[in-house]
Amino acid sequence: MARVKPLGKKLRMAKAIKQNRRVPPWVVAKTGGRVIDNPKRRHWRRSKLKP
């Protein structure tokens, strides 16, 4: 990938990095185990971001 990226693409990638986290333990505790997994989790090799 190019080292110099357009600003829009860079911002989208930064947002994707922030979204790609597990559910915090305090959320699991607060919801009583109803919320365990994050449906928006993305693996870098299995599914790619839109360009």
From Swiss-Prot:
<dbReference type="GO" id="GO:0005840">
    <property type="term" value="C:ribosome"/>
</dbReference>
<dbReference type="GO" id="GO:0003735">
    <property type="term" value="F:structural constituent of ribosome"/>
</dbReference>
<dbReference type="InterPro" id="IPR023626">
    <property type="entry name" value="Ribosomal_eL39_dom_sf"/>
</dbReference>
<dbReference type="InterPro" id="IPR000077">
    <property type="entry name" value="Ribosomal_eL39"/>
</dbReference>
<dbReference type="Pfam" id="PF00832">
    <property type="entry name" value="Ribosomal_L39"/>
</dbReference>
<dbReference type="InterPro" id="IPR020083">
    <property type="entry name" value="Ribosomal_eL39_CS"/>
</dbReference>
<keyword id="KW-0689">Ribosomal protein</keyword>
<comment type="similarity">
    <text>Belongs to the eukaryotic ribosomal protein eL39 family.</text>
</comment>
<keyword id="KW-0687">Ribonucleoprotein</keyword>
<dbReference type="GO" id="GO:1990904">
    <property type="term" value="C:ribonucleoprotein complex"/>
</dbReference>
<dbReference type="GO" id="GO:0006412">
    <property type="term" value="P:translation"/>
</dbReference>
<protein>
    <recommendedName>
        <fullName>Large ribosomal subunit protein eL39</fullName>
    </recommendedName>
</protein>
